[in-house]
Amino acid sequence: MSKEIYAIHPPWLRVTHWLYVVAVVILVMSGWRIYDASPFFPFFIPKEITLGGWLGGALQWHFAAMWLLAVNGLIYLFFNIFSGRLWHKFFPLSLRAIVADLLDALKGKLSHADLSHYNALQRAAYLFAIADIIVIVLSGLVLWKSVQFPILRELLGGYEAARRVHFIGMSALVAFVGVHVAMVALVPRTLIAMIRGH
């Protein structure tokens, strides 16, 4: 069997995956500290799980990690699109297949024997995560450079609405990561495949 066929995850995918982990952890933890400086919901994030110590420090961490996320994301999309992996791994996808796989998962009958193949639930979840990160980036641009992106700001309903979109997008990503980590705990060889490639 050739190495190309045997490999489940190519090197570029593994590298971008782990860079995403670093970027998302930094962005979420520093973002929580930024939120605490001016909350719009009736709660605060515990300081112990935030990053930056104070607003200025949190902003520095956030701005540094946003570049990592952006560059890494472009590399990820480039390789996924031009290698054909995006179409091969995530499509076709139908609502019927998603519902069927969801019901199987709830019954504990969803198979994950072939790590090289994504089931419909995985395809939908990963496509959701990609779309969610795009929404987070676009709303983040409004928060970072509101004057330079007036059309985007208005499309999102204004600066304050963009803050909420950004926070809700982050919350959805954290929920995705939580489910993703739980699934990895249930099928540990997926972690080995993401480290070694097979």
Swiss-Prot record:
Induction: Part of the SigF regulon, induced by chlorite under positive control of SigF. Part of the probable yedZ1-yedY1-mrpX operon.
Gene3D superfamilies: Transmembrane di-heme cytochromes, Chain C
Bilayer disposition of the protein: Multi-pass membrane protein
Listed GO CC annotations: plasma membrane
Record's keyword terms, sorted: Cell inner membrane, Cell membrane, Membrane, Stress response, Transmembrane, Transmembrane helix
Subcellular location: Cell inner membrane
Gene deletion effect: Growth somewhat inhibited by chlorite.
Cited Pfam families: Ni_hydr_CYTB
GO MF annotation terms: electron transfer activity; heme binding
UniProt entry tagged with the keyword Electron transport: no
GO biological process: respiratory electron transport chain
Segments crossing the lipid bilayer: 12-32, 63-83, 124-144, 167-187
Family to which the UniProt record says this protein belongs: Belongs to the HupC/HyaC/HydC family.
Record's function text: Part of the YedY1-YedZ1 system that may repair oxidized proteins containing methionine sulfoxide residues (Met-O).
Name of this chain's protein: Putative protein-methionine-sulfoxide reductase subunit YedZ1
Lineage of the species this protein comes from: Bacteria, Pseudomonadati, Pseudomonadota, Betaproteobacteria, Rhodocyclales
Gene name per UniProt: yedZ1
